[in-house]
Amino acid sequence: MSVDIDTVKRVARLARIAVDEEDASRMTGELNAILGFVEQLNEVDVTGVEPMTSVIPTTMKMRVDEVTDGSKAEDIVANAPQTEEHFFLVPKVVE
């Protein structure tokens, strides 16, 4: 598969990215190089290779699940202009 300049412009338009003619031609070459590398990866025989998420088998460390208030209430409301009992006070906007 190869990418032409029209495809680059179309993808840029769909992504809402402004791309001028010079950048589009540069990106065409870069995308073709990336796709060439991916095609090389597709040629690798992975028959019998078990899928993995990490090179080294790891397990997540478990900790006790306990409920706390986070001890951050004062820090959270510290810069608020108005607070009351760790809640933000804001002007009423709906009658």
UniProtKB/Swiss-Prot annotation:
SUPFAM superfamilies listed in its UniProt record: Glu-tRNAGln amidotransferase C subunit
InterPro entries in alphabetical order: Asp/Glu-ADT_sf_sub_c, GatC
EC assignment: 6.3.5.-
Gene3D superfamilies documented for this protein: Glu-tRNAGln amidotransferase C subunit, N-terminal domain (1.10.20.60)
Any one Gene Ontology molecular-function term assigned to this protein's record: glutaminyl-tRNA synthase (glutamine-hydrolyzing) activity
PANTHER family, sorted: GLUTAMYL-TRNA(GLN) AMIDOTRANSFERASE SUBUNIT C, MITOCHONDRIAL
Known role: Allows the formation of correctly charged Asn-tRNA(Asn) or Gln-tRNA(Gln) through the transamidation of misacylated Asp-tRNA(Asn) or Glu-tRNA(Gln) in organisms which lack either or both of asparaginyl-tRNA or glutaminyl-tRNA synthetases. The reaction takes place in the presence of glutamine and ATP through an activated phospho-Asp-tRNA(Asn) or phospho-Glu-tRNA(Gln).
Family statement drawn from the similarity comment of this UniProt entry: Belongs to the GatC family.
Name assigned to this protein: Aspartyl/glutamyl-tRNA(Asn/Gln) amidotransferase subunit C
Organism this protein belongs to: Chelativorans sp. (strain BNC1)
Gene label: gatC
